[in-house]
Amino acid sequence: MCLHHLRKCRTTNQGLHIRGRWTGIKLEIIPGAEEAQLLCNNLVENTESGVGNFAYVDVGGGSTEISLLHDGVLAESHSFNIGTLRMLAGAVTPEERNAMCRMLEKYAEDFPGTKIIGSGGNINRLFRLAKIKGDSRSLPVATLKQLYAELAPLSLEERMEQFKLKDDRADVIIPAAEIFLLVARSLKCEDILVPNISLADSIVDGIYRDVQGNMASKDNKE
């Protein structure tokens, strides 16, 4: 929830500048769309062709960030006030939920065969709980539905005991699963890609791409 508010706050850049002067360390907030582009570039480079339609879905406590990519290029990016903590507090409005669903359904019509790239600690934990065999990083939506059906009826303590979850994961994992299932239904997706790639890896990869591009441009001029 903190990152969501930092990205929206007008005074964030001023605050980061002041802290940079105090510490000598320059800080920068990466926009959700840029984060999605970095992670998607890294994912498609390591797993498959960049051709195709992807929905990068990052579920947080305060919001769900959805970035839509077509053939490796960012088409549009949206932020919805639908997060795990908001859902637990009953603070998600039907209007916000419907707005997200309508946007996704429209994208599915315009770009059929869209694949979901799931991001965040909850979807990674759900993937591990699913115990997918082999090297696949794809979580079938049917498996997620089954896992949700097992988790949802349990108390917080039962989830912690039976599924070895920490208390701060055992509560938010339920609304997180609900959000991903809602997104999958709206996009008519049967699988969710859960890459084992961190944002730090993707930033380094992005810097490498920039350096390679600058070197190639310099060579062409010479």
Where are these regions (language model features)?
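Helical "lid/coupling" subdomains associated with nucleotide-phosphate turnover
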Residues: 3-53, 68-222
